[in-house]
A protein has these predicted regions:
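HotDog/MaoC-like acyl-thioester-processing domains
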Residues: 43-49, 57-114
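Short structured motifs
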Residues: 34-41, 52-53, 66
Length: 114
């Protein structure tokens, strides 16, 4: 169901941030979703598995950073694609924070950079 896919999208994004971002940045910033755009091209049944792949399609705009998550079935076919927009907040103040180069560096190259 739709809510399950949204939960998986958030889990994948969170895992990517946790595994790539520095400890300092993880302690200083949090992310909130401002937009989900999800395309459904297939479904999975009970007992079937999917594989998720995530990447950053382009650099940030101010406090916002887009992310793409594709889910593939066992045959490798993309069955769900999601484009999500995240906003970065300063953990202490809860205020929007411009996404700086040192925050983005570990996630490069972006898809639009070849």
């Amino acid at each position: 169901n739709n809510a399950v896919w949204v939960d998986w999208i958030q889990q994948v994004a969170t895992a990517h941030w946790s595994n790539v971002a520095s400890d300092e940045h993880q302690a200083r910033y949090i992310w909130v979703v401002t937009r989900h755009e999800i395309d459904y091209r297939g479904n999975v049944g009970p007992g079937e598995t999917v594989t998720a792949e995530t990447f950053i399609p382009r650099g940030p705009t101010g406090a916002r950073f887009d992310r793409r998550v594709d889910f593939r079935d066992a045959a490798g076919k993309v069955i769900v694609s999601a484009n999500t927009t995240w906003a970065m907040l300063e953990r202490e103040s809860g205020r929007l924070a411009r996404v700086r180069e040192d925050v983005t560096a570990p996630f490069r190259p972006f898809a639009d950079e070849g």
